[in-house]
Design a protein with these regions (language model features):
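Active-site nucleophile-His-acid catalytic modules used for acyl/amide transfer and hydrolysis
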Residues: 19-38
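A structural motif
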Residues: 10-22
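Soluble non-cytosolic domains of exported or imported proteins
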Residues: 4-11, 35-40
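...with weaker cross-activation on analogous glycine-rich loops/strands in unrelated enzymes
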Residues: 14, 46, 50-130
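Surface-exposed loop/turn and secondary-structure junction residues enriched for glycine/proline
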Residues: 28-30, 42, 57
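Active-site nucleophilic cysteine motif
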Residues: 33-52
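A general structural-boundary detector
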Residues: 4, 31-32, 74
Length: 130
């Protein structure tokens, strides 16, 4: 659940994450269309960004790292991406297809994760204003 003071599009992002948070991991999932039966890492991040009105079409991890948003961390949403993986922090919660070392929250596919993960090797990006 998004904080009560979160902007409407951030609340929409959290709702979108909730809608797919138990879908299976499918390589390439979410790239032909935002609506899919499974998602890979960047497909899941794309789905949530689209729901927030921050992305027009699905984007692979590499371009997320190089061309989406502005460098740095946002107040509400930060995307962490490199050439082979992407995940995001939305309203303080990590949305990731990888457990990232969280042994208490296993499972592949998009999941809200409580534990932070190592950020080395990732580029932090945000949408200005968010």
């Amino acid at each position: 659940m998004a904080p009560a003071d979160a902007p409407a599009n951030i609340q929409a992002a959290v709702a979108a994450g909730n809608a797919i948070h138990t879908f299976p991991y499918v390589w390439g999932g979410g790239h032909r269309s935002f609506t899919d039966t499974g998602y890979d890492c960047s497909g899941a991040v794309s789905y949530v960004l689209h729901a927030a009105g921050l992305l027009a079409s699905p984007m692979p991890s590499g371009p997320m790292a190089s061309s989406w948003g502005a460098p740095g961390m946002g107040r509400w949403i930060t995307v962490y991406a490199n050439a082979s993986h992407a995940y995001m922090i939305v309203a303080g919660l990590r949305f990731d297809t990888s457990s990232g070392g969280d042994r208490w929250n296993q499972g592949s596919g998009p999941r809200w994760r409580k534990k932070k993960r190592q950020m080395g090797g990732f580029t932090a990006k945000y949408a200005p204003g968010y």
